[in-house]
């Protein structure tokens, strides 16, 4: 049965009425960019998550896919895999630079073409190149991450989005092919201290430069390894992009030790607008897709769930950074 056939009657009525209204209001939307995290029925209709797979045939997996993301990770379902190698980060020994954007949906950092940042190891059989760092956050603390652990959300989630550079020439091609993408997720809590990498992105001089949609600010001399905890475990599963077209080509790697930012930094994020300055303010917060069924997919981890009290010790629980001292 197709996605449209499975659509509930009330939702179908809302969709068709909104589509009819949208056809008479202003220019036609770009079909590749016509989506939102919340259904906007005040003015132009913009389809939220329940409608993604219905308004564009290329996004059908958003409605009918069986390996969709994000998911709720129940730790009792995680299979301990002692043969998972540590994660490895390669920056060529150089500092990261790039542009921080307010896309109207996310806070997004796009790295410059050089240096090339790669991640490998863990469940990855190939080297994957960093394409984007994306920050998702909620309107209230404890409810901003896409993924959950044991039904518990976090205030924010940082996603490092990579494509397989050994098999594909660019992100677009990789998103359509097997073993195409890898996304590392780090959870974020609100506390009295702040992760040093996130502090560079969220300090007042930086975050106020991207207050509105399409604002951008160039950053340099960033040390990406500072984003990661000193030691951590990870959980991996096969899933999808959590935005249209919801391609099921993603190896997700969830870092199991959360980062911190301050309440002031979180407040600054919530003051970012998803609209340009000429339009009414709407907070960028709440930019996450609802949870998707895990179904029969396997969850693997490098930490033995039979002994959760044990601390992560040894090289397998550290990020290996090429050229950095002490295995970092």
Swiss-Prot record:
Keywords: Glycoprotein, Secreted, Signal. It holds the Pfam family Carb_anhydrase. Transmembrane segments: none annotated. Residues 319-328 have a biased composition (Basic and acidic residues). It comes from the Eukaryota. InterPro entries: Alpha_CARP_X/XI, CA_dom, CA_dom_sf, Carbonic_anhydrase_a-class. Residues 1-23 form the signal peptide. Belongs to the alpha-carbonic anhydrase family. This is Carbonic anhydrase-related protein 11. It comes from Pongo abelii. The gene is CA11.
């Amino acid at each position: 049965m197709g996605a449209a056939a499975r659509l509930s009657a009330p939702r179908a009525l809302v969709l068709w009425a909104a589509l009819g209204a949208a056809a008479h209001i202003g220019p036609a939307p770009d079909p590749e960019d016509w989506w939102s995290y919340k259904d906007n029925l005040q003015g132009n209709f913009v389809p939220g998550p329940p409608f993604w797979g219905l308004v564009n045939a290329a996004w059908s997996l958003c409605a009918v896919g069986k390996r969709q993301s994000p998911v709720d990770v129940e730790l009792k379902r995680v299979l301990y895999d002692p043969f998972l190698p540590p994660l490895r980060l390669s920056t060529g020994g150089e500092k990261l630079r790039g542009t921080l954007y307010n896309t109207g949906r996310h806070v997004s950092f796009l790295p410059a073409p050089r240096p090339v940042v790669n991640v490998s190891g863990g469940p990855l059989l190939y080297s994957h190149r960093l394409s984007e760092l994306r920050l998702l956050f909620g309107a209230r603390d404890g409810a901003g991450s896409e993924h959950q652990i044991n039904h518990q959300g976090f205030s924010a989630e940082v996603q490092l989005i990579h494509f397989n550079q050994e098999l594909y020439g660019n992100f677009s091609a990789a998103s359509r092919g097997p073993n195409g993408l890898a996304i590392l997720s780090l959870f974020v809590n609100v506390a009295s201290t702040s992760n040093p990498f996130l502090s560079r992105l969220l300090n007042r001089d930086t975050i106020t430069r991207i207050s509105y949609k399409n604002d951008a600010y160039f950053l340099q001399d960033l040390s990406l390894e500072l984003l990661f905890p000193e030691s951590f475990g990870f959980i991996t599963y096969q899933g999808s992009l959590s935005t249209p077209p919801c391609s099921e080509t993603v190896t997700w790697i969830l870092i199991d030790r959360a980062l911190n930012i301050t309440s002031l930094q979180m407040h600054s994020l919530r003051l970012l607008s998803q609209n340009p300055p000429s339009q009414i303010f709407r907070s960028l917060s709440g930019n996450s897709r609802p949870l998707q069924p895990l179904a029969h997919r396997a969850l693997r981890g490098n930490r033995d769930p039979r002994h959760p009290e044990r601390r992560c010790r040894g090289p397998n629980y550290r990020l290996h950074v090429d050229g950095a001292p002490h295995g970092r």
